[in-house]
Structure formats: structure tokens, C-alpha cells
Amino acid sequence: MSLTTDPVADFLSRVRNAIKARHQKVDAPASKLKTELARILKEEGYIANYKAVEEEGKKLIRVYLKYGSDNVSPISNVTRISRPGCRVYVGSKEIPRVLGGLGISILTTPKGVMTGRQARKEGVGGEVLCEIY
């Protein structure tokens, strides 16, 4: 059993490493926040699918990675912004645009986990979890 101090960074690192190794799927310990991150990645077209699985009594989230016809993933970079030691909060007017709108930022807001674009539209700010492009 691994005890990590930053489960979101662990999840993002597992996805990043699996993409670099050209794996078709990757498993990570499940949580509500990681499930929401996977949901957003699927909605935005960065992963093929995800599902909750249970192996040996442990709840996992299985992420199915997506590759184009040239075997290149839509995810080229994943950056963790807010960390346990240095939280980053922004208002609705300060939500970062990633690569001029080509990438996404993912935030936790009072209205749930959403992309920076959705948060701007709804006029809410929150904690910037990561940027993906």
C-alpha cells in the first residue's frame, strides 16, 4: 500500500508515465476527486474512457488511454499547479488560459470539479489543480 501526500499528483504521474510507455490502460487508487478528473479528461477528449474496478478488495480507477493514428497521445504535458505545500486559488477573472485556449486547466470550485472554461462561464473561482495540453 502506497501512502502519498499528494494523490492528485500521483494520479497525473501515472497517466503521464503510461502515455510515455505507450500503455493502453493504467490503474490508480480510486477517489471521488480522481474520478472527476478522469471524467473531465474523457469529456475533453484526452482519454478514451475510464471505469471503476475492484481488485483484491481495493477500489481502483482504470483509465483507458487514447492515441491517434500516428500513435501520438492528445496529452503532451501535464502540470500540477496547486500542491499540498503551496495551494493556488484564483478568482473567476484570474483563471489561466492554457496555450491560448488549446489546453485546459482543471479547478475544484464550490460547484464541483470543472475546466477553467466552464468555471469562467459560470463565474466561479477555485483551486487550480492542474494544466493539461
UniProtKB/Swiss-Prot annotation:
UniProt keyword RNA-binding present: yes
Annotated keywords: Ribonucleoprotein, Ribosomal protein, RNA-binding, rRNA-binding
Claim: RNA-binding is one of the keywords in the record: yes
Molecular function terms, GO-annotated: rRNA binding; structural constituent of ribosome
One record GO biological process: translation
Alphabetical list of Pfam families matching this protein: Ribosomal_S8
Function: One of the primary rRNA binding proteins, it binds directly to 16S rRNA central domain where it helps coordinate assembly of the platform of the 30S subunit.
Subunit: Part of the 30S ribosomal subunit. Contacts proteins S5 and S12.
Protein name: Small ribosomal subunit protein uS8
Organism: Koribacter versatilis (strain Ellin345)
Classification lineage: Bacteria, Pseudomonadati, Acidobacteriota, Terriglobia, Terriglobales
